[in-house]
């Protein structure tokens, strides 16, 4: 049974056009899939669109009623604190109202870069070595993992990457572009070769 699924909705605001309702409906269907199939952890790579669009999505689809009904803990991975004040406030609200739940875990990767995640983890480890909290010889993969944005979660069993693959027709070929870079080492990866607007949770997870 899959414990952790990660899906990266890789699409620009230009490519979304006027189809935000469709895009966010696809993301919502994925969240419903997590709940109905009792997937413990779901990580969603949010699209690079205007902050206010993300605020609208979170307020409408990931509201207090959803959180309380499903007892899901919401987390955000990435440098979300660098985003607009309105979005940061909404993120803090969700962190606050969901913090005591543990029936399921819903993570949103936003303003996230896999290389930066590893660099930031290394900086934290170096500081701990300098401050004599750990020895240099104690540094290993587990120590790096403990200092990642995703330190509290097991790596995904399955990663699904949306987006056209530069004209290639095979779903097995594509670019992960650093999504959950450290944690993707042993994950099964599916490239849908379809736009995020065409994402279908039942079909695309069945590719696995």
Task: Tell where the protein language model's regions lie, with residue ranges.
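Flexible, compositionally biased loop and terminal segments
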Residues: 1-208
